[in-house]
Amino acid sequence: MSFTDPIGDMLTRIRNASSARHEKCLVPASRLKVRIAEVLREEGFIKDFVLHEDGVQGAITIVLKYSADREPAISDIKRVSKPGLRRYVATDSIPRVLNGMGIAILSTSKGVMVDREARKQKVGGELICTVW
């Protein structure tokens, strides 16, 4: 099955599973998706993820994170740069998500990173998504 926007599909699966209070969600794997999952884990939005290698593509099982009263750690996750309209930002125009309460994930020449790290390293890139 071919997707127009595989990253958007991953983010939608995470958003839907989180709002339905599921423990895990399964996503088809790619190197970019694995790196996005690593960033989400480092920033504390998901508990963990497991990469399943099975033949050509594989899959990622993402373990979602909730508070003690079952509120999801991810309030919202939005795709910014889409296949039909790519959004690139320079270092000085990287947005602050909810005044620093959320994160923006960028794909830069130095890899996939959060907005704080991109500002620190003074690199811009493609604004993949925002999470809060």
From Swiss-Prot:
Disulfide bonds: none
InterPro entries assigned: Ribosomal_uS8 (IPR000630), Ribosomal_uS8_CS (IPR047863), Ribosomal_uS8_sf (IPR035987)
Cellular component GO terms, alphabetical: ribonucleoprotein complex; ribosome
GO biological processes: translation
Signal peptide start and end residues: none
Gene3D superfamilies, sorted: 3.30.1370.30, 3.30.1490.10
Keyword Membrane in record: no
GO function terms (MF aspect): rRNA binding; structural constituent of ribosome
Keyword terms of this UniProt record: Ribonucleoprotein, Ribosomal protein, RNA-binding, rRNA-binding
Matching PANTHER family: 40S RIBOSOMAL PROTEIN S15A
Assembly behavior: Part of the 30S ribosomal subunit. Contacts proteins S5 and S12.
Role noted for this protein: One of the primary rRNA binding proteins, it binds directly to 16S rRNA central domain where it helps coordinate assembly of the platform of the 30S subunit.
NCBIfam families given in the database record: PRK00136.1
Family per similarity comment: Belongs to the universal ribosomal protein uS8 family.
Protein name: Small ribosomal subunit protein uS8
Organism: Anaeromyxobacter dehalogenans (strain 2CP-C)
Gene name for this UniProt entry: rpsH
